Amino acid sequence: LVGRLLGLKISRIVFASFFSFIVPLFRSKKIIKENLNIFSKITPNINETEIIDSMWKNYGMTFIEYTFLNYFKSKNSYTTIKNENLLSQIIQEEKPVIFVSGHFANFEIMSMEITKKKIPLATIYRPLNNIFLNPFMEYLRKKYICKNQIKKGINGVRHTIEYLKKKHCIALMIDQRVSEGEKINFFGQPALTTTLPAQLSTKFNLDIVPVYIQRDKYHNFLVEFKERLNPSDFKIKLELSEELNRILEKMIIRNPNQWIWTHNRWK
């Protein structure tokens, strides 16, 4: 309600400031510092203060943008798509692909833009820890982003396969730690990593499409669809998962200010 009263532009400024100045007072800085320490060993001379401040501001803007998802859904002026021809190819081929990305900028924009192109899609999501907020977020995602929401977990894998058999593409974030994953190098440190994209890609012979998302200085979005990965180019599934981590690293290096450094990625 506050966001609607203020409008999108003012709401972004207000919530970016709130998350930048107030929220860090109640959140531990330990994990962020540890993560940036790992990152700095690969990319020295980073400005930690700028990265942390920008991250919190992006958090705030993303949070309030959930109340404006209908704007983003109904208009194309907020988003620029790079390599859009790849989406046209996917539509013509009528064969599913697996879209993967990380929590960059407003990460929900990826699935929204794919569905706006009329590509059948199901997205895998991780429920929020907040049991009161989670139902509302699920409602917004189903209404404005993608109606086919798959809850992460064993049952989610089964539902994912069912959607693939119905020729739906799958979208998921691959940058968070998963207890059932394998330890794969990420910025030079072993990190529990989801192998689901590689498993599905290999089993069903599906291409994987990495997607980069960025918020520009005007707070519009760039959604860049990267070159496809074909499972036949990799000897084993582990190699494919390793390549996905390398691609993710490049995305983070490209714009570390808009990635979520609060997640305990290397636990």
Language-model-derived ranges and their functions:
Residues 10, 32, 55, 110, ...:
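Hydrophobic alpha-helical segments typical of transmembrane helices
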Residues 28-31, 130-131, 191-194:
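Active-site metal-coordination segments of metallo-dependent hydrolases
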Residues 42, 47-53, 89-92, 116, ...:
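Non-catalytic C-terminal accessory region of glycerolipid acyltransferases
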Residues 1-101, 136:
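Membrane-anchoring hydrophobic helices of lipid-metabolizing enzymes
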Residues 93-153, 180-182, 190:
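Catalytic core of membrane glycerolipid acyltransferases/transacylases, capturing the structured
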Residues 28, 106, 156:
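Short phosphate-engaging motifs
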